[in-house]
Amino acid sequence: MGKDTIADIITSIRNADMNRKGTVRIGSTNITESIVKILLREGFIENVRKHRENNQYFLILTLRHRRNKKESYKTILNLKRISRPGLRIYSNSQRIPRILGGIGIVILSTSQGIMTDREARLKRIGGEILCYIW
């Protein structure tokens, strides 16, 4: 039984969001670094630091919060894992779904690397749909 690193980072971010934690610590791999760069570029997280501890690298993410009248802080981050090791989901460039009419993003793994749905449509390439973020 293999380990699903993408599901692990999605679960870590979602759990930190529900508990209103400001930071999340996740293991650093090439896939997680690519996904975190997309989250940072799209504005879903504030800051990323790479931390080394006992010859292992970790990424420390600072989550982005917004003020809400009823609650003190509310995170605007919702994540959903789509393709998983037991059921891979692929899409060509014309059938990449739009999340909330373009407000959310789809992260894809393509032949040219991990990218958002907008980048994949511009380059006219499809790939494996990793997750939805809105």
From Swiss-Prot:
BP terms from Gene Ontology: translation
Single GO molecular-function term?
Answer: structural constituent of ribosome
Where is this protein chiefly located?
A: plastid
Q: Does the keyword Translocase apply?
A: no
| Top-level taxon | Eukaryota
Keyword annotations of the record: Chloroplast, Plastid, Ribonucleoprotein, Ribosomal protein, RNA-binding, rRNA-binding
Location of the protein in the cell: Plastid, Chloroplast
List GO terms (cellular component aspect): chloroplast; chloroplast envelope; chloroplast stroma; plastid; ribonucleoprotein complex; ribosome
Q: What does this protein do?
A: One of the primary rRNA binding proteins, it binds directly to 16S rRNA central domain where it helps coordinate assembly of the platform of the 30S subunit.
Q: To which protein family does this belong?
A: Belongs to the universal ribosomal protein uS8 family.
Its subunit composition reads:
Part of the 30S ribosomal subunit.
- Recorded protein name is Small ribosomal subunit protein uS8c
What is the organism of origin for this protein? Arabidopsis thaliana (Mouse-ear cress)
Q: Which gene encodes it?
A: rps8
